[in-house]
A protein has these predicted regions:
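Active-site-proximal, substrate-binding regions of enzyme catalytic domains
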Residues: 38-70, 75-79
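Short glycine-enriched loop/turn motifs at secondary-structure junctions
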Residues: 21-23, 63-64, 99-102
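Active-site neighborhoods of divalent-metal-dependent phosphate/nucleic-acid chemistry enzymes
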Residues: 67-113
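Buried hydrophobic packing segments
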Residues: 9, 37-41, 99
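Residues within well-formed alpha-helices
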Residues: 5, 54-57, 78, 82, ...
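Acidic, PIN/NYN-like endoribonuclease modules and their adjacent C-terminal/linker elements
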Residues: 1, 34, 97-130
Length: 130
């Protein structure tokens, strides 16, 4: 099982292969991942960094992704503790770390800042480490 964050999901949804390279993994994410990923895709399209067609394809891939939403008991409290420990004002990224910690699995991200800070809390890997 792997927790995936919006950065890795958006990257996959925009790639030619989509999420296929992650098909062998059981993927989970906190509920906020879908809002974050959708927002990133919308912003990329709005800024004209991606075409309308690619945005539509990526959004379809996101909605069809075989990723299970998870909200275990204590997720919010754990995210607050992690944000405090790491000196973060916001709990968005901490929620991914908290989910991985509560489920006793690793977090997969392409976000270097999250990876560097998060390794103090839980196992965090990038796509090349799969």
């Amino acid at each position: 099982m792997l927790v995936v964050d919006a950065s890795v999901v958006v990257t996959a949804c925009l790639s030619e292969a989509g999420l296929d390279p992650l098909a062998k993994e059981q993927l989970v994410a906190p509920h906020l991942m879908w809002s974050e990923a959708s927002s990133v895709l919308h912003e990329l399209r709005w800024r004209k960094e991606i075409s309308n067609e690619l945005a539509a394809t990526a959004l379809r891939r996101l909605s069809e992704a075989d990723i299970s939403p998870r909200r275990p008991k204590g997720l919010t409290d754990e995210a607050w503790r992690i944000a405090d420990r790491l000196g973060w004002a916001k709990t968005y990224d901490a929620e991914y770390l908290a989910l991985a910690r509560l489920l006793r699995c690793q977090l997969l991200t392409t976000d270097a800042k999250l990876k560097n800070a998060g390794t103090r809390v839980v196992g965090v890997i990038g796509p090349t480490e799969l």
